[in-house]
Amino acid sequence: PRTVGMSRRDLERQGFAGEVGQSVVIPRRDGATVIAVGVGERPSSGDLRDAAAVAVRNAQRHQDVTLDLLSAGSSNSADARAVTEGALLAAYRYPGITAKPDTQPRFASLTIVTSGAAAVERGVREGVVRSRATYLARDLANTPPAHLNARDLEVIVTDLAPTHGFDVEVFDENDLEEMGCGGLLG
């Protein structure tokens, strides 16, 4: 309650009890918006991930988002990773093929308030890496087959391999036939 600038009683009057996933949006006179999101008594990393996602979805039109992990009583790497993932994945929009670009603004900066900077920084880095990988997987899965065929996928993956340290093995039609991949060839 201290962080959002309202007493527990005032929050309860708004119908907010702090239950997992529950949220209330509180506009302030200075133009900022505070979003209180419930995480329960002893939040798990999953609860914190979900809470970060709820906060970001509620803060859609705001460029700067601050998530207070300290109020949730956490300062460890796993929770920081979960909060980062929740925030970034909630902001994901398929950029896809469209005549009308997505004009919905997403946040430009994300600040996580906490203690234990070294552990939190490590968790944030891991969360960013995992979120980027998920963005790529979502983009590829959401792209219609007419716009992303096997050769396109080959180019994307071979371009990513040196940067991200993985090997790529490309099979041609004959290789696939020898491997018994008739269904894939069909």
Ranges and model annotations:
Residues P1-G186:
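Short amphipathic alpha-helical segment within the helicase RecA-like ATPase core
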